[in-house]
């Protein structure tokens, strides 16, 4: 059984999390709690019954220039465009192929929609680390940047429609 996403705290066990990508595994262990404490990003984790992290994602605020954004994303927007960055998203190898990543994107989308009721946000942005990740994000509604196909975005309106 896996828990619903909750904010990372000191009681969570970060090792032996292994998604198969060293940089993402290492970020969870070495940076996630520091960023949580300083406010640089917020990490949300799903755990097993023993508080071991089995999946996670992080969110941070940012902005993108209009020339790096797809047409619908930049239409009628200031430069730069306010966004939330889906900074990391990973699922332990033991849960690959079970829809957990898609559920994490949905949860992140719901949080972004909630935040957008308080502050101005155009949508969510992600930097895919591989072609496989890029294809996944495109399947869940993200559109690639015209300047960088590994940077993908989804508008707030599309998030609302998809969740």
Curated annotation (Swiss-Prot):
It holds the Pfam family Acetyltransf_7. Induction: The tacA2-tacT2 operon is up-regulated about 15-fold in a relA-spoT-dependent manner within 30 minutes of phagocytosis by mouse bone marrow-derived macrophages. InterPro entries: Acyl_CoA_acyltransferase (IPR016181), GNAT_dom (IPR000182). Acetyl-CoA binds at residues 89, 91, 96-99, 101-102, 132, 139. Disruption phenotype: Deleting the operon causes 90% reduction in persister cell formation in mouse bone marrow-derived macrophages. All 3 tacA-tacT operons can be deleted without an effect on growth in cell culture. Homodimer (in absence of antitoxin). Forms a complex with cognate antitoxin TacA2. Forms a 4:2 antitoxin:toxin complex with cognate antitoxin TacA2. Belongs to the acetyltransferase family. GNAT subfamily. This is tRNA-acetylating toxin 2. It comes from Salmonella typhimurium (strain 14028s / SGSC 2262). The gene is tacT2.
């Amino acid at each position: 059984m896996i828990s619903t996403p909750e904010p990372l705290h000191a009681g969570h066990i970060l090792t032996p999390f292994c998604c198969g990508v060293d940089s993402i595994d290492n970020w969870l262990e070495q940076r996630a709690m520091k960023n949580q404490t300083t406010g640089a990003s917020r990490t949300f984790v799903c755990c097993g019954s023993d508080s071991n992290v089995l999946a996670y994602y992080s969110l941070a605020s940012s902005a993108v220039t209009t020339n790096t954004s797809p047409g619908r994303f930049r239409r009628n927007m200031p430069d730069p465009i306010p966004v939330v960055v889906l900074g990391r998203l990973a699922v332990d190898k033991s849960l690959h192929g079970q829809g957990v990543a898609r559920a994490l994107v949905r949860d992140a989308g719901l949080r972004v929609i909630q935040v957008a009721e308080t502050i101005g946000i155009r949508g969510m942005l992600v930097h895919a680390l591989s072609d496989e990740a890029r294809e996944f994000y495109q399947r869940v509604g993200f559109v690639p940047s015209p300047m960088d196909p590994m940077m993908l975005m989804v508008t707030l309106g599309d998030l609302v429609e998809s969740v």
